Amino acid sequence: MKKLFGTDGVRGVANVYPMTTEMAMQIGRAAAYLFKNGNRRHRIVIGKDTRLSGYMLENALVAGICSMGVDVLVVGPLPTPGIANITSSMRADAGVVISASHNAFQDNGIKFFSRDGFKLPDEMELKIEELIFSKKIDSLRPIATEVGKAYRIDDAVGRYVVFLKNTFPKELDLTGMKIVLDCANGAAYKVAPAVLEELGAEVIPYGIKPNGTNINAGFGSLHPEVISEAVKEHRADLGIALDGDADRVIFVDEFGNEVDGDHIMAICATDMLKHKKLRKNTLVATVMSNMGLDIAVKKAGGKVIKTAVGDRYVVEEMLKGGYNLGGEQSGHMIFLDHNTTGDGMLSALQVLAIMRRSGKTLSELAEVMIPLPQVLVNVRVTEKKDIMTIPEVAALIRGVEDKLKDEGRILIRYSGTEPLLRIMLEGQDKYQITGWAKEIADLVEKKIGGK
């Protein structure tokens, strides 16, 4: 059982355990020790988003890693997928991301990429914890002449911009397109506008003035209403919203209607099927994806495989099965032909390329999928116990499942990063499933709720 690492690295409130400088330094030391392999000089890339606490955690990690005789390449604020990309392109031994993704600025997190740009497997995270909690790491100290150095990589943003532009078809550009772009005052505030402008688009930017405390605050992929209003106001072709570390993207079409991750997957999967580019004709999604996605992909001659929630599990399934497209309803898209992890801007470019090639608007493309009505209710809990061990709750859930039959589904799971139980229902009748979801949520709240 892991004590520090959750579904997406170590996460918590900045300057409160485990997100302290002391723990960050220990994590850096343990990771550096594990990534060393042989007698050569080793290098680890460190990047971050725009949170104020990024400075303190970055310096603690640099100190910890250097103290183990490993050099550090500091890239500064850069999208999470950009850090993965730079890690593999610079042939570093690992990459570290300091970010809490879409969470508020008070939180921060630390996660790792292996040398090939993929997230670490659970076993490696357990080894890092074991070294820290057994105190073994305390006695491992290279002599003074063997400690590491830290270097700043000044052109990391430029390198990533070039990489992204190279994923867009050479024969196409974005001339004449008006795009509203929301960078959530996060890590993509320089990269994303540059990519779209260099490809010829007229960009109307929002959320590009980070101050350390405004990341995700009223902007970004969790607030599509910002780009929705802006698209209508500016009569733009579409809106693109990234989250704080730019590993996910949400769109709105030319009418200001939201186009979520399921629709993006449907658009990309059906286009790739048409051009015979979808490996094994299979899309990998999670159990949170709408049944409408399965129907759309099946109709186009493909199939959908479902995994647990979390882009790391999507990637694991993709690598295991040899698939090249996967994603989540929340907007994480993984195009393994191009990158190793969820990449908001890369996904946006793939959708823009389909729009350009087909001559269709985003609303026309989004018609490929008709979602079943879906309701999601979150309940704050005091403990994460197996919900089916509470007899009244289990009986209510089974009763609802019987009523839904094959016309819908119910999915109940705990958040990997917060004390929340997520209750999701899908069915033909929105009012009916809303009532059932509320009924289950109220009962859970009564039993294990925490205000």
UniProtKB/Swiss-Prot annotation:
Catalytic activity: alpha-D-glucosamine 1-phosphate = D-glucosamine 6-phosphate
GO cellular component, one term: cytosol
One Pfam entry name: PGM_PMM_IV
Top-level class of the enzyme under EC nomenclature: isomerase
Co-factor binding comment: Binds 1 Mg(2+) ion per subunit.
Modified residues (Phosphoserine): 101
Entries under InterPro entries matching the protein: A-D-PHexomutase_a/b/a-I (IPR005844), A-D-PHexomutase_a/b/a-I/II/III (IPR016055), A-D-PHexomutase_a/b/a-II (IPR005845), A-D-PHexomutase_a/b/a-III (IPR005846), A-D-PHexomutase_C (IPR005843), A-D-PHexomutase_C_sf (IPR036900), Alpha-D-phosphohexomutase_SF (IPR005841), GlmM_bact (IPR006352)
Gene3D superfamilies membership: Alpha-D-Glucose-1,6-Bisphosphate, subunit A, domain 3 (3.40.120.10), Alpha-D-phosphohexomutase, C-terminal domain (3.30.310.50)
GO biological process: carbohydrate metabolic process; peptidoglycan biosynthetic process; UDP-N-acetylglucosamine biosynthetic process
Catalytic residues, chain numbering: 101 (phosphoserine intermediate)
Positions that bind Mg(2+): 101, 243, 245, 247
EC number, as in UniProt: 5.4.2.10
Superkingdom assignment: Bacteria
Cofactor dependency: Mg(2+)
This protein's UniProt keywords: Isomerase, Magnesium, Metal-binding, Phosphoprotein
GO molecular function, one term: phosphoglucosamine mutase activity
Family the entry assigns: Belongs to the phosphohexose mutase family.
General function of this protein: Catalyzes the conversion of glucosamine-6-phosphate to glucosamine-1-phosphate.
HAMAP family: GlmM_B
Protein name: Phosphoglucosamine mutase
